[in-house]
Amino acid sequence: MRRLFFCFMAMMGVLTLSAQSVYENEVINNIMTRTSIRQYTNEPVSKADIETMLRAGMAAPTAVNKQPWHFIAVTNKEKLAELAGRRGMIKQAGVAIVVCGNLDKAMQGKAQEYWIQDCSAATENILLAAKALGLGAVWTGCYPMDDRVTEVFKVLKLPETIVPLCVIAIGHPAEQPTPKNKWKPENVSYNEFGGKAE
């Protein structure tokens, strides 16, 4: 009996080890194992989780701390269907977060385009927050594709100074794709283009 007990405990140890994170650091592991999820269950996304993701988005860095963004959380099923167009995953999502640039809050002149970087950083934060909450998400682009931007403008009744960068479809995952290993040393240089590590 004792032998059976120890065998069972050893098996549990192996299972625990195999289920451990690839990286010990939780944040790094979250980044490395995040992947696009395009299929969702019918379970709704809670208001608390939506707010957490929005807070994560607003925690992103911005040029001169302008925070030139506006977020629209869409949970209404009819609106989601309108917003989806050819992107079916949005229709079945529990929520879609539309990340927009607010040109009234953006820097002026050539620097105005920094809103794109700022809102992209916010988008990645939302994707990582979704992963941390056990949700699945996928980033679908709008700007600078005129047809997509116009479509979102119309559905969400946006004023001219609010420009949709992307629509993030989010829900409880109905698929578990294996994260891709995107590490490619040939895409890295040190000290100058083509430079090798010392």
Language-model segments: residues:
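Acidic, surface-exposed loops and disordered segments
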Residues: 6, 18-198
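Positively charged n-region of N-terminal signal peptides that target proteins for export
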Residues: 1-4
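Hydrophobic h-region of N-terminal signal peptides that target proteins for export
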Residues: 10-18
